[in-house]
Amino acid sequence: MDPNCSCATRDSCACASSCKCKECKCTSCKKSCCSCCPAGCTKCAQGCICKGASDKCSCCA
């Protein structure tokens, strides 16, 4: 169980330590969401890449 995820390892959760997912149900949380995405980002599951600022990333900019 990753401390930053609400799923158990048997659910194929592989979050990175920098990921702040609340509901990780994917195989690689690092690629499907990121802490820099603003709340309500509907594209957060399309491979975000953070770009520095806490509210900027490749899919929500």
From Swiss-Prot:
InterPro entries: Metalthion_dom_sf, Metalthion_dom_sf_vert, Metalthion_vert, Metalthion_vert_metal_BS. Residues 1-29 are annotated as: Beta. It comes from Oryctolagus cuniculus. The keyword Acetylation applies. Residues 30-61 are annotated as: Alpha. A divalent metal cation 2 binds at C7, C13, C15, C26. Class I metallothioneins contain 2 metal-binding domains: four divalent ions are chelated within cluster A of the alpha domain and are coordinated via cysteinyl thiolate bridges to 11 cysteine ligands. Cluster B, the corresponding region within the beta domain, can ligate three divalent ions to 9 cysteines. A divalent metal cation 6 binds at C37, C41, C44, C60. This is Metallothionein-2D. Monomer. GO terms for biological process: cellular response to cadmium ion; cellular response to copper ion; cellular response to zinc ion; detoxification of copper ion; intracellular zinc ion homeostasis; negative regulation of growth. A divalent metal cation 5 binds at C34, C36, C37, C50. A divalent metal cation 1 binds at C5, C7, C21, C24.
